[in-house]
């Protein structure tokens, strides 16, 4: 009797090789996929060799289970991390301090109107980014999208501009943090720079999980502080503070001078408001380090609505009711004392609270500093994956850290010590930082505009090549027209910045002011043309645009909402969009 006389294949009865069981704690070391595009590889469980040996081994190259040579980023961020990062990501010195100069330049009405307009713009931008980030949770995120969906040369130019923005922001924010301490003490700024430099280096060297936990705590503090200020500001405005001799304020202050410096002041506030939202897009950059982008990113994206509605608009309306735009303290020397939030508390003669809120400002600056190193390092790593930066920046260790890119970024933090050059009675550091920041001053507009244009190209190509939106894990409810509007807003931002750079408030046209405001556009154009000549890249047609590599598609049954039917469907859609 032979095997073929039986009703089964003899190989089917051979014992199968069982996969080893992995505990939940150890699953953190294992990624869900491995592709060259996403930069994800399987993390091999570390051996128990002792703390110091594992610490040393952690710096060794990541082990690539599939042997494809792709660099690795560890998926160590959870839903909890992403949602707090999205809420607190843009709550920082732009809101707490930058709003003061905006109030002085354009008046309270200009501040409120422009922050609402920029909030609407970011609503469209972040939803477009969220859709692409769920579909392509890749290293480099929106910089990768610009390279693939727009033009490789444009992706190269925008990526380097974006990198320089956060690369320079790191030492600048360290200096800002040190200056903020002058609110309490005259201790040399170099002392505080050293302390916070060590702290930031430590946070980043411990990996993305520690980064996520630190940002979670810092964001939570900022959220609580901002909500607390809103409540306090309402009490102050209603005359509920016994130490405030002004009594009931109401709208008496905002009526005096709602607008300042005319149209020029309005345009100036428009660009200042846009800079205040810098960092919102980091949620998309972190997609490559999120365990389940489809479940995590949509919730983080939807938090943009609440961030704009509550933390920016409400708090700035109250600031406009409490602080006069003519207050000379608003245009101070860059310390925390010029914060309109601190001024509002000081004007009410509340003892102790100004120091508390000054501490919150320091925390927010630390958060921005921490995010800057994370963003610059991941951007440089992503560019190396796309061959837009030297290949050695792809190096990733066994803990999922882009080690060489991080070392380069963290090393530039020592540049903050140039602040000591001011001790001799000159302003060398101010001049140097002004021009360093000018190199990438428009990177936000280029990045946000590129996100919208990438989404437009992605949607057009997706439809052209016969795909359905039902295949996507998350779909922007604003669709392609939301991205068109978002792109239009960013073009207006560039036009407004050109206008105020050419005709500065309180001065006549001059080369210094113009190039400090618009140098980034010139440099980006040079990078774009230079890469075009070098690579001879071209814009692909819609039917040839590569939308399949790395695309994560889903069955419609998994993505549709079974409750999205019935008489309340329209209201459910609105609630699902913002909640």
UniProtKB/Swiss-Prot annotation:
UniProt record, GO biological process: amino acid transmembrane transport
Pfam family, one: AA_permease
Superkingdom classification of source: Eukaryota
Segments crossing the lipid bilayer: 84-104, 109-129, 162-184, 187-207, 216-236, 266-286, 304-324, 348-368, 402-422, 432-452, 472-492, 514-534
PROSITE patterns in UniProt: AMINO_ACID_PERMEASE_1
Principal subcellular localization: Golgi
UniProt GO molecular function: amino acid transmembrane transporter activity
Ranges of the Extracellular topological domain: 105-108, 185-186, 237-265, 325-347, 423-431, 493-513
Name of protein: Amino acid transporter 1
Source species taxonomy: Eukaryota, Fungi, Dikarya, Ascomycota, Taphrinomycotina
């Amino acid at each position: 009797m032979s095997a073929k006389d039986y009703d089964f294949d003899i190989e089917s009865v051979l014992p199968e090789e069982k996969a080893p069981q992995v505990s939940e704690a150890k699953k953190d070391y294992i990624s869900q996929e491995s592709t060259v595009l996403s930069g994800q590889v399987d993390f091999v469980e570390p051996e128990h060799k002792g703390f110091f040996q594992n610490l040393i081994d952690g710096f060794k190259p990541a082990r690539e289970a599939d042997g494809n040579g792709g660099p690795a980023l560890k998926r160590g961020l959870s839903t909890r991390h992403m949602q707090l990062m999205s809420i607190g990501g843009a709550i920082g010195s732009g809101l707490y301090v930058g709003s003061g100069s905006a109030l002085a330049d354009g008046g309270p009405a200009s501040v409120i109107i422009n922050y609402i307009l920029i909030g609407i713009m970011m609503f469209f931008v972040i939803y477009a980014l969220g859709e692409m980030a769920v579909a392509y949770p890749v290293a480099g995120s929106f910089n990768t999208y610009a390279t693939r969906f727009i033009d490789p040369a444009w992706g190269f130019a925008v990526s380097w501009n974006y990198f320089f923005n956060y690369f320079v922001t790191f030492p600048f924010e360290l200096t800002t943090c040190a200056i903020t301490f002058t609110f309490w003490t005259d201790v040399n700024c170099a002392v505080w720079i050293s302390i916070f430099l060590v702290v930031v280096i430590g946070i980043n060297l411990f990996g993305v999980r520690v980064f996520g936990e630190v940002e979670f705590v810092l964001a939570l503090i900022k959220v609580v502080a901002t909500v607390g200020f809103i409540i306090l500001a309402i009490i102050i405005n209603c005359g509920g503070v016994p130490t405030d001799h002004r009594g009931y304020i109401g709208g008496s202050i905002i009526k005096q001078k709602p607008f300042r410096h005319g149209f020029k002041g309005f345009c100036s506030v428009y660009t200042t408001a846009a800079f205040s939202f810098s960092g919102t897009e980091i949620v998309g950059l972190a997609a490559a380090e999120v365990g389940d982008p489809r479940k995590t990113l949509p919730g983080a994206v939807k938090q943009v609505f609440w961030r704009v509605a509550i933390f920016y608009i409400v708090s700035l309306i109250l600031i406009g009711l409490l602080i006069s735009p003519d207050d000379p303290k608003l245009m101070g020397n860059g310390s925390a004392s010029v914060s309109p939030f601190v001024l509002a508390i000081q004007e009410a003669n509340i003892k102790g609270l100004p120091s508390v809120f000054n501490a919150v400002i320091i925390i927010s600056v630390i958060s921005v500093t921490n995010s800057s190193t994370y963003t610059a390092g991941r951007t440089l790593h992503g560019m190396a994956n796309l061959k837009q930066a030297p290949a050695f920046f792809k190096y990733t260790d066994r803990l999922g850290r882009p080690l060489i890119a991080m070392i380069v970024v963290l090393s530039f933090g020592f540049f903050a010590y140039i602040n000591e050059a001011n001790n001799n009675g000159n302003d060398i550091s101010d001049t140097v930082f002004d021009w360093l920041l000018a190199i990438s001053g428009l990177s936000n507009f280029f990045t946000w505009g590129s996100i919208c244009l990438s989404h437009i190209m992605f949607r057009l190509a997706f439809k052209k090549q016969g795909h359905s939106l039902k295949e996507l894990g998350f779909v922007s409810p604003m669709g392609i027209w939301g991205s068109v509007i978002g792109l239009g807003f960013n073009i207006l931002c560039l036009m407004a910045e050109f206008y105020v750079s050419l005709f500065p408030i309180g001065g006549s046209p001059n080369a210094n002011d113009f190039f400090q405001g618009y140098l980034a556009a010139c440099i980006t154009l040079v990078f774009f043309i230079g890469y075009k000549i070098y690579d001879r890249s071209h814009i692909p047609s819609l039917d040839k645009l590569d939308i399949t590599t790395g695309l994560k598609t889903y069955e419609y049954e998994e993505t549709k909402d079974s409750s999205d039917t019935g008489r309340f469907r329209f209201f459910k859609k609105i609630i699902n969009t913002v909640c």
